[in-house]
Amino acid sequence: MTIWVDADACPKMIKDILFRAAIRTNTNLILVANSYLTYPNSPFIRSILVEKGYDRADHYITSHMKAKDLVITADIPLAAEVIVKQGLAMSPRGELFTANNIKQRLTLRDINEQLRSAGERTGGPSALSAKEKTSFANALDRWLAKNK
């Protein structure tokens, strides 16, 4: 099993949790981004640099991931594609995206996008809280325990 990270928008504190977990459990961790990333020197961690452009990292992840791989992303359309490919998608806040909740999340995203197009200010996500960081770490540990 591999953990893929949509790394451009992933918070540093979440990447740090992922680095420690990958090293501790000997789990492959692949960061995909369109900018250079720094990460610990480990045989289990690597970075893929994709061209700058719309959804380049997303396309790389979905074309290289395998069923049952874990993808860390806040990108709802990417999460939906991961689910279609039989992978597991988790947000940096520890929320698991599933076949049962992804349609609702896509609908909400589309509504917010329509509001933004009409000039409404919908705001972005709030800063990651300590509780959400813990929630992510716990969800990751559960996945690792199940899949190692």
UniProtKB/Swiss-Prot annotation:
CDD domains: PIN_YqxD-like. It comes from the Bacteria. It holds the Pfam family DUF188. NCBIfam families: PRK00124.1 (NF001095). Belongs to the UPF0178 family. This is UPF0178 protein lpl0088. It comes from Legionella pneumophila (strain Lens).
